[in-house]
């Protein structure tokens, strides 16, 4: 009975650690998934933007001479509310403007590439919310309608699904005219350095860590998980101490029979190992079962490296 109680406690706490870790990783991924798809080395923002893509604007004269081959791509970004023409089903999204032949262009899993003006590619999380191929969407209350011609996956930024469109369409949406050649950032695929007055080049890891709210969220979950791991060790230690104290007379008999102290200590550690392994194994099975029943909209992602 006592050993079953130890296994149950290890199982419950380990399951909570795994569950919180999965939520933490899932939320963190939603902030950065679209950025990870680029497999880029760095990003160039306006210096005043304080490492924040949302606040960055690059004028044509600042970036036009920086393009060198296919390793640098222009990116436009704006937040958007998408809805149907009748005003129903408002959905929050992020809009990325890009050139369809750049390395920033998303992989399409359903539908076709955008070929005409005002055609867009959307992350499949919008599909989960009811958006279908061929749907016409308004963005930020615009009179212009944007047709969804394809879906991509694993493209979210700031926890919101991304809608991809051509740069000229983006400029018309954000600045009111495609003649305004502003962009939000330059994304650099290779390791080249860009030094230009008024611009700031950041590594992708530095840029991601400065996404508003990203770092506090990661730290909060990390402290919670660390505290639960510490509690697990404390509880396990207390249980094993109590069980060991209760068996003191038995260990005395074993010593009287000539059994070495090292073997007795080893047996205690083997008990701890077996009970812990059993509890952790049950927690892993419970986590796999949980993953099967959770809705797709839940930011839950199993990452065994995080558990380790």
Residue map of PLM features:
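N-terminal Sec/SRP start-transfer signal
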Residues: 1-18, 211, 269
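Membrane-proximal extracellular/periplasmic loop immediately following the first transmembrane helix
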Residues: 29-82, 92-94
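Hydrophobic alpha-helical membrane-associated segments
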Residues: 12-19, 23, 232, 236, ...
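Hydrophobic secondary-structure segments that place a key small or acidic residue at a functional site
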Residues: 76-78, 91-99, 106-169
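Mechanotransmission and gating elements of multispan inner-membrane complexes involved in transport
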Residues: 142, 151-228
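Short helix-loop junctions at transmembrane helix boundaries
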Residues: 273-308
